Curated annotation (Swiss-Prot):
Matches recorded under PANTHER family: LYSINE--TRNA LIGASE, CHLOROPLASTIC_MITOCHONDRIAL, LYSYL-TRNA SYNTHETASE
Similarity-based family: Belongs to the class-II aminoacyl-tRNA synthetase family.
Biological source species: Tolumonas auensis (strain DSM 9187 / NBRC 110442 / TA 4)
GO CC annotation: cytosol
Protein name: Lysine--tRNA ligase
InterPro entries registered for this protein in UniProt: Aa-tRNA-synt_II, aa-tRNA-synth_II, aa-tRNA-synth_II/BPL/LPL, Lys-tRNA-ligase_II, Lys-tRNA-ligase_II_bac/euk, Lys-tRNA-ligase_II_N, Lys-tRNA-synth_II_C, NA-bd_OB-fold
Listed EC numbers: 6.1.1.6
GO MF, one example: magnesium ion binding
Any Pfam family the entry gives: tRNA-synt_2
Leader sequence segment: none
Amino acid sequence: MSEQNQTPDAELDVQEFNNEMTQRRAKLAELRTKGNPFPNDFRRDQISNELHAAFDDKSQDELAAEKHYVKIAGRIMTRRIMGKASFATLQDMGGKIQIYVTRDDLPEGFYNEQFKKWDLGDIVGVEGYMFRTNTGELSVHTTSIRLLTKALRPLPEKHKGLTDQEARCRQRYLDLIANEESRRTFQIRNQVMNGIRNFLNSKNFMEVETPMMQVIPGGASARPFVTHHNALDIDMYLRIAPELYLKRLVVGGFERVYEVNRNFRNEGISVRHNPEFTMLEFYMAYADYNDLMDLTEEMLRTLAQNIHGTTKIRYAKDGEEGIEIDFGQPFARMTMVESILKYGNDVKAEELTTLEGAIAVAKRHHVELMKSWELGHVITAIFEETAEHMLHQPTFITEYPAAVSPLARRNDDNPEVTDRFEFFIGGREIANGFSELNDAEDQAERFQAQVAQKEAGDDEAMFYDADFVTALEHGLPPTAGQGIGIDRLVMLFTNSHTIRDVILFPALRPSNK
């Protein structure tokens, strides 16, 4: 088959694919007779984007006069053989660059006996000098070329790429080879992670690591994964959040700490949820939730400017036309009840002051309720149904009910709510933060209430953590803490419609099931 028609397994007839594999293995066998087809002694000195940065503004005459020599390496993505000369496109971590190969520039017989037998997907090392073709394309005039890795399987077809999302996630390595957009997504993810660390480090935060396996899972309301430690002969849990350990560190005197790491929750998979996900959590002593909102606003504005060169980005949730999100304007702030009244249409404020009234509102809006719920639970469920999806521009929702905020400090003016916010963009929760509860007796009572909910059938209710209560009894300074979902943040900055597009290897059902 021709190189122009090479396609991945899903696109090929089984017999055609088998023939392709047979041909490539035969080529590999022949190459082995002439030396090692997998050498490891080639060292490049530049990558493609560096070449473009250095020479894109050079004219054909300037390049010819300078004759700048380079050593590059990459995967053959396209090739045009024209008798005694060929053009090929190499792809590396920086992008793509064209190479020009002629028979006369290579050792006798090499062009026909080796180079022309290489396939798309093979990885080569090239030495040569920069020049510009008559059509104006920056290229490397090859003076030496070596095969570094023989590919036995064909690349995804170049015009279609790897378009099936399931296949893209399952074979991410092929997705990264074939789709420039996917490579860009994960490059931006790296920028987000680095940007967050740089920002927090500049604010005198210290990065720490806390246990991934815990005897008592805490810090969030979620169903944990359970494992067993053979040496200790105890069940342990993959962490659902690092919060309680980070606050222990604040008790110990590390007054500004953060952690960027994985959390695990044994729950459903959706466009917004993956059971293994990346979370930033940070805590600062002598601060409250208002300080966190200010810090979050500054951090996200800085990230947007540094990554995209502007504080305005476009986000198209679920494949819609999209909206412009402006990080340059002050972020909106409203209470949970205010948001329900704004977006709930027929909801009256007095209805949200009693359990009976709130249940009536919930029924009108077809909100499913649990019998054990208090007023705060019902109000939160109404908010999630009526208002959450309407919060397109950056918005902080404050005054979360104490019933759904077991770790947050109660509001001084209204103890039924807490000094807590959740942050929304594009109709999705991005962050959760609050002034920390540092009253050990109040915390113990709330843990006991969570235990009662768990006994009533709520699998996501928290365990009682006696050691954490003990830590609070030693004194936690006034503290504020926050968690930001990195995956959802990357979805926003890359205009991705599903969380699977921003996680390199997301959870998938086995292909044989």
